[in-house]
Amino acid sequence: FYASLKNEDGLLKAGTKLADAQVSLPFYQPFVAEVQSSSVVADDAASLLTLTAGNLSVGFDKETGALTSYKEGSTELIKEALRPNFWRPVTDNDMGNGMNKTLRPWRDAGRQAKLLSMKQKALGKEAYEVVSHYKLPVGESDFIVAYHFSGKGYLDVNCTFIPGNDTLPLLPRMGVSITLNKQFSQMEWLGRGPHENYIDRNTSCLLYTSPSP
């Protein structure tokens, strides 16, 4: 809902928005047919572990422990492997408190993570688990990524961060990043915006859908 000026008022032109609000409405959720499950077949080569279920497959590099491939048939989705990521875009407030300098060690921590172990095991005939354990260069911290691939083609990714000590610099964020091939560019973001929406600017941010540039 919007409230705006019907007529010009001093310096404010007609149509100037004065207030806005959003309310939640019930939404229709279409029926989605249940996906049939298939057996998960593992191809454990010297440098690559490939798991296949039906026409879907995922691949893991044994040297890095990273997810490097996700295919539907012959179509590859991934351009750059999934990796830990502890950095985010710097805001004006961040620049003011020097965050881009004091927290800089986290910027490349994901790329510099060293693989300690990569464990794999079948969970019955229709599921497989891969767990990659990394040591981070910041404070000797640990980062564990657990992948669960099911016979329905679902890939669940769970991450665990274990701080190495109590004196680590503040963590800008904790997550992973991945780069898809360029044909997968039609993405949309549902969230608050369009400007930054930290707690000091959250009221003016409404939920909206924004397409990728």
Where are the model-predicted features located?
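Short beta-strand elements
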Residues: 9-32
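Beta-strand/loop-rich accessory regions of lumenal/periplasmic or secreted enzymes
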Residues: 28-210
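Short, aromatic- and glycine-rich surface loops/edge beta-strands on solvent-exposed regions
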Residues: 1-5
